[in-house]
């Protein structure tokens, strides 16, 4: 069903109702201003010239130089054949955080269409060979590449797997169910531990929405799986049975470490955009582990580790999800979700058992819902977006507690990353031309709370987010 579209809507109300709305808005504004006075403000730490090499959310942070400091890699993309189905990296640029280009593959473009793509580019930063320096693992021109993080030189390369003729007609998520190329054009990439090694050394690549391929660190294919249900954007690797090997949640299907299907959720439509593992800390399921998933028009889903649905909230096209300690006075980790209708969405907030507490609409697109360790006292804030008035961070009650300064910073993208100093997060905003990095306006602190969060080496625009006291899987 396609929702009705309107060119213009005029909403009227009585004078008394309008006065009540204005009073509520003023009360909310006063409550936000009072809260903001109690927390550190954003202080501009660095302004970086990206020299025309910027992008959308195709940004990765890591330790390319092995000196304990962060560097970053940005990928620009080229779209091919059909919309976002076969995007490929056209320019890959490594920077230090002073804005110096360390190396570059390809040529940058001023076409801003490079940043508006509904897919990940295949790219992660990770020390996959254990030499103490992060490599850049990527794919381009139907090859998987392991690049030296310091120089960009190729350390290993291998052709991507063939898309076999036998699979044509059964491939989901591509026009006419026929793949456009002889070899797979990777749509995303994840570091996994299917072999149960001392550290993750396996690489997962996937096509748009149907097939996943597990590679070892020599770029040899160990197994592949063709899904009967949409794979979603970023499958989640996790050891759910304690055997030391990662299993893989591919959309609604759970695979074992050899790529065999273990179970499937009783959902067939649309696809999972983001997945976050959780553990109930209270209520009837206390101690049980679960997956919190946003699944497009299927809404917000919570399943146990056997695929049984425990909760399903039909909130519309559910798009993003995060779990963190947003309300320290309540048990467990609260959940926040946003939906997406091609523009602004509604933010939904749930307690740790998946019961909805409140909802709000800030009329802006691209709400991240990233947990931010801003104060270092164990409470997480929710990063929305980089808008000065309606962005910034809110707390678990929906109160705007930290605002962005009105300093001309880029507003296309934002992220929370612990880049400097103590264990508290910095806030990064960027577009195609510049990057701003903010930190707290107070002094670095000792003995700051350091949560367990998603590792840098598995970055994605579709990964969901979590911030826990400890790793429990």
Language model features with spans:
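Beta-propeller-forming repeat regions
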Residues: 2-473
């Amino acid at each position: 069903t396609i929702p009705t579209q309107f060119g213009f809507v005029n909403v009227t109300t009585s004078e008394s109702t309008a006065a009540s709305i204005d009073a509520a808005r003023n009360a909310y504004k006063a409550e936000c201003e009072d809260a903001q006075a109690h927390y550190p403000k954003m202080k501009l730490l660095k302004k970086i010239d990206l020299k025309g090499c910027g992008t959308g959310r195709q940004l990765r942070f890591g330790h390319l130089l092995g000196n304990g400091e962060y560097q970053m890699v940005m990928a620009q993309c080229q779209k091919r054949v059909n919309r976002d189905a076969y995007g490929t990296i056209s320019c890959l640029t490594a920077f230090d955080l002073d804005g110096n280009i360390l190396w570059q593959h390809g040529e940058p473009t001023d076409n801003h269409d490079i940043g508006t793509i509904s897919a990940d580019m295949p790219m992660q930063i990770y020390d996959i060979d254990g030499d103490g320096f992060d490599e850049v693992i990527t794919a381009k021109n139907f090859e998987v590449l392991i690049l030296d993080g310091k120089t960009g030189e190729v350390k290993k390369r291998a052709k991507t797997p063939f898309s076999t003729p036998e699979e044509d007609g059964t491939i989901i998520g591509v026009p006419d169910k026929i793949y456009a190329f002889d070899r797979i054009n990777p749509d995303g990439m994840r570091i996994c531990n299917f072999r149960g090694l001392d550290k993750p050394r396996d690489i997962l690549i996937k096509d748009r929405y149907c097939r996943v391929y597990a590679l070892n660190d020599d770029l040899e294919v160990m197994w592949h799986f063709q899904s009967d249900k949409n794979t979603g954007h970023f499958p989640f690797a996790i050891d759910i049975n304690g055997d030391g090997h990662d299993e893989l949640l591919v959309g609604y299907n759970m695979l074992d470490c050899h790529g065999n299907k273990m179970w499937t959720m009783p959902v067939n439509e649309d696809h999972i955009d983001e997945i976050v593992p959780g553990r109930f800390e209270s209520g009837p399921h206390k101690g049980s582990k679960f997956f919190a998933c946003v699944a497009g028009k299927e809404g917000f889903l919570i399943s146990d580790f056997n695929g049984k649905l425990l909760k399903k909230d039909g909130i519309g096209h559910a798009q993003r999800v995060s779990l963190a300690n947003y309300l320290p006075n309540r048990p467990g980790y609260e959940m926040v979700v946003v939906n997406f209708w091609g523009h602004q969405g509604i933010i939904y907030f749930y307690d740790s058992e998946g019961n909805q507490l409140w909802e709000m609409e800030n009329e802006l697109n691209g709400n991240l819902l990233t947990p931010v360790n801003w104060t270092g006292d164990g409470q997480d804030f929710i990063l929305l977006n980089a808008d000065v008035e309606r962005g910034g961070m809110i707390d678990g009650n929906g109160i705007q507690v930290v605002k962005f300064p009105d300093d001309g910073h880029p507003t296309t993208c934002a992220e929370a990353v612990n880049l400097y100093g103590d264990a508290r997060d910095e806030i990064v905003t960027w577009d195609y031309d510049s990057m701003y990095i903010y930190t707290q306006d107070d002094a670095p602190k000792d003995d700051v709370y350091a949560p367990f969060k998603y590792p840098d080496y598995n970055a994605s625009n579709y990964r969901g987010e979590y911030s826990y006291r400890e790793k429990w899987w």
